C-alpha cells in the first residue's frame, strides 16, 4: 500500500469525522474505544447502539430535567466496545461557565457519580467500571453552588480523561452541561469548545504533506544513487 494512499486516508477520515459531527446529531453519548494503544472517544447513539461520530471530544448534557433533582442530570452516558476492561473516568480539577463569548472560571464544583463513587472537580477525582457487553452507563452529574447555596442558571464546562490498564490515557474531552438556559445558547457554548479547544483535523494536513514530501525526497535520493 502506498504512502500517499495511507496519508490521504488518514486526512480524509479526520475531515469526515468533523463533517459528521457538524451535522449536529440529536444526542451523542461518550464512546470509548482503543486506537494504536491509546484510548480515544467518539460519539454513539445508545438507543440504536450505532457509533455516529468515530472521533468526538465535546459532549452535551442537560441538568435539572427531573424536578426532584434540579441540579443533576445523567447525560452524556458512556458506552464502550472494550469488553472485560476496567475503565476509569477522570474528572479534572475546576469548571468554567459560559459568558456568551467564551468561558470564565466558576467558583462552583461538579460531582460525577457512579455506583457509590463520587468524583469531584474541586481537586479532581475518578470513578471506575467494568465494561460489559452492551454497556450503557449513565453517571449522575451534579452542579454544586458555594457553601451549600443553589447554583444559578448557566452553561458549565467540565473536563475529563479516561484511562485503563494497558492503554495510554485519552486526550481531554469535555461535557457542556446546561442548567435552564436556551438550546441556542447551549449550542453556541458547545460550538465554542469545538472551535477553540479541540485541535482541528485541518492542522494535520501540513504534517501529512511534510511526511509525503520527505518520502518523495528519500525516493529521489535512492533513485539517483541507483542510477550512479
Where are these regions (language model features)?
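Positively charged n-region of N-terminal signal peptides that target proteins for export
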Residues: 1-4, 217
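Single, functionally critical "micro-switch" positions that shape active/binding sites
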Residues: 2, 199, 223
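Small-residue packing motifs within transmembrane alpha-helices
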Residues: 4-8, 206
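Sec/Tat signal peptide C-region and signal peptidase I cleavage site
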Residues: 17-21
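Mature extracellular "passenger" or substrate-interacting domains of secreted, surface-exposed proteins
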Residues: 22-197
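A short, hydrophobic C-terminal helix/tail in secreted or cell-surface proteins
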Residues: 199-217
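C-terminal membrane-anchoring or membrane-association module
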Residues: 213-228
Amino acid at each position: 500500500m502506498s504512502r500517499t494512499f495511507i496519508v490521504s486516508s488518514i486526512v480524509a477520515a479526520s475531515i469526515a469525522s468533523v463533517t459528521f459531527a457538524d451535522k449536529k446529531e440529536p444526542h451523542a453519548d461518550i464512546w470509548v474505544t482503543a486506537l494504536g494503544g491509546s484510548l480515544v472517544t467518539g460519539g454513539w447513539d445508545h438507543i440504536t447502539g450505532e457509533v455516529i461520530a468515530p472521533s468526538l471530544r465535546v459532549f452535551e448534557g442537560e441538568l435539572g430535567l427531573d424536578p426532584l433533582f434540579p441540579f443533576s442530570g445523567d447525560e452524556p452516558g458512556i458506552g464502550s466496545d472494550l469488553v472485560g476492561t476496567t475503565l476509569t473516568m477522570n474528572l479534572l480539577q475546576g469548571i468554567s461557565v459560559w459568558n456568551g463569548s467564551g468561558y470564565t472560571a466558576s467558583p462552583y464544583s461538579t460531582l460525577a457519580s457512579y455506583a457509590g463513587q463520587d468524583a469531584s472537580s474541586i481537586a479532581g477525582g475518578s470513578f471506575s467500571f467494568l465494561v460489559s457487553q452492551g454497556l450503557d452507563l449513565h453517571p449522575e452529574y451534579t452542579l454544586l453552588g458555594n457553601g451549600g447555596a443553589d447554583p444559578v442558571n448557566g452553561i458549565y464546562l467540565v473536563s475529563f480523561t479516561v484511562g485503563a490498564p494497558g492503554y495510554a490515557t485519552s486526550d481531554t474531552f469535555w461535557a457542556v452541561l446546561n442548567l435552564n438556559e436556551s438550546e441556542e445558547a447551549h449550542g453556541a457554548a458547545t460550538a465554542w469548545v469545538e472551535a477553540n479547544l479541540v485541535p482541528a483535523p485541518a492542522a494535520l494536513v501540513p504534517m501529512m504533506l511534510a511526511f509525503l514530501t520527505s518520502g518523495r525526497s528519500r525516493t529521489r535520493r535512492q533513485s539517483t544513487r541507483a542510477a550512479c
